[in-house]
Amino acid sequence: MQQVARNEQIQLAPMIEEIFTDLAPLAEKNGIALEREGDGVMIGSDALIYRMLFNLAENAVKYNRPDGSVRISVAQEDKMLHIRVADTGSGIPEEFRRSIFQPFFRVDKSRSREYGGVGLGLSLVWEIAGLHGGSVWVEESSERGTVFAVELPAQ
């Protein structure tokens, strides 16, 4: 991905609400509650940041338990945005927590038909965070769920 991030002011709370609206049919089908907390402002490409957050949220919905929840929280501290995408799914095994950001990688290839996609979502998340001077990682994962953390420069 060679595109340079555009310099647009991005307010994250309305963007997250839009993502939740787009994911509502999938979430409702599985009884997943969507929750947002906090807000922040950054400079970058609104289309790319939307794609990054959408991919994280969509995975959190798709790989969740029935009647689970997805929470996106945003905190702005000094010159950094701290974004957490937390779900109540079954977690990501420790040995795969770095590999999941590689293109076409899947933790469980046998489930790819069930969930769709080709395994590019998290590699795009990694690239988009990097294009904006940030980073993404699995902060926590257990049988109670997973938390992805993203840090990006704030406005």
Segments and roles (model prediction):
Residues L26-E35:
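Short conserved segments within the C-terminal catalytic ATPase subdomain
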Residues D87:
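Acidic ATP/Mg2+-coordinating residue in the GHKL
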